């Protein structure tokens, strides 16, 4: 992503903030805006900016000013367009998706309803993720589609770039390249981080031939896509449960290719995970991409499974 585009995404995210914090965010140096990953607002404490250097105060001029609960309420109103009722379901799951595809994680007091659902009130903190589109990132991955695309698993630690790479691969498969035809891609976007759907429209580029199930658990969404969208590829973010593997195995048995991510610090940790052992035993994936970071740069390694 070009620096100007990265700064532009920062400014879009900053526009969601309460007015006094918007002003502080705009005074951040340009190079830091380009590196920013998250705004973090915690009631009773100053707002911080997460970068590769860690959490930093947004402004030295406001070191003792604290985020108030009114600030957090204003943020939620701005993101939902003053229609929290319409966003109650995702808010109860701990997040909101704003215009532009920005995901806002929320903490507060949780009330468990009789039907097992949850509601969130008395918001105590919010994390505004500055999602970025890095186009052409797939070209840095060695031989990920050599001989044609095959089912691929991406592994990296939290914040290691899995979702960004996954999104670019989805768009690339969906749009096609000079030497590859476009494929129909189905995405189960359980937490709204891949497509950033806002009122039914993807705010992030996931390709021209992509169908998205938003806010749906992977184990439910994968068979739904098989029935409704006739995909050639199904993509999901963050495999966490055995039920996810069962659904992906069923899709693979129907001839569908899979593209997914999983948390792991490195290949050694990945191979110790029971979920990974289940995946290899099921034979769902044919390629593994691991992402590591050294000296501020990400490195990609591809191997056969």
Residue positions per predicted region:
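Conserved P-loop NTPase
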Residues: 113, 118-121, 286-305
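Hydrophobic positions on the alpha1 helix immediately C-terminal to the Walker A/P-loop
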Residues: 165, 169
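P-loop NTPase switch/communication element
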Residues: 174-223
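Hydrophobic anchor at the beta1->P-loop junction of P-loop NTPases
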Residues: 154
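P-loop NTP-binding catalytic core
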Residues: 84-149
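Conserved P-loop NTPase nucleotide-binding/switch module
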Residues: 229-288, 293
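N-terminal accessory targeting/assembly segments
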Residues: 1-100, 175
């Amino acid at each position: 992503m070009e620096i100007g585009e990265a700064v532009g995404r920062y400014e879009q995210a900053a526009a969601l903030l309460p007015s006094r914090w918007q002003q502080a965010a705009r005074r951040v140096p340009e190079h830091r805006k380009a590196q920013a990953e998250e705004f973090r607002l915690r009631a009773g404490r100053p707002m911080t900016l997460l970068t590769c250097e860690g959490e930093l105060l947004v402004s030295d001029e406001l070191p003792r000013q604290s985020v108030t609960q009114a600030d957090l309420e204003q943020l939620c109103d701005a993101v939902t367009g003053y229609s929290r009722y319409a966003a109650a379901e995702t808010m109860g799951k701990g997040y909101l998706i704003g215009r532009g595809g920005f995901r806002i994680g929320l903490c507060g007091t949780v009330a468990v309803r009789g039907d097992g659902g949850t509601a969130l009130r008395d918001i105590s903190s919010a994390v505004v993720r500055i999602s970025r589109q890095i186009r052409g990132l797939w070209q840095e991955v060695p031989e990920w589609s050599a001989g044609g695309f095959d089912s691929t698993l991406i592994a990296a630690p939290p914040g290691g770039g899995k979702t960004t790479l996954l999104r670019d691969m989805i768009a690339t498969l969906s749009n096609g390249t000079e030497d590859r035809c476009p494929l129909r891609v189905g995405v189960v976007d359980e937490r709204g981080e891949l497509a950033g759907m806002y009122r039914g429209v993807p705010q992030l580029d996931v390709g021209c031939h992509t169908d998205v199930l938003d806010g749906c658990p992977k184990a439910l969404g994968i068979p739904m896509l098989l029935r409704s969208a006739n995909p050639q590829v199904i993509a999901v973010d963050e495999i966490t449960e055995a039920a996810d593997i069962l659904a992906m195995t069923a899709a693979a048995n129907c001839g569908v290719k899979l593209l997914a991510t999983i948390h792991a610090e490195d290949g050694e940790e990945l191979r110790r995970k029971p979920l990974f052992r289940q995946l290899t035993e099921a034979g769902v994936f044919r390629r593994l991409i691991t992402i590591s970071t050294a000296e501020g740069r990400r490195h990609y390694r591809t191997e056969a499974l």
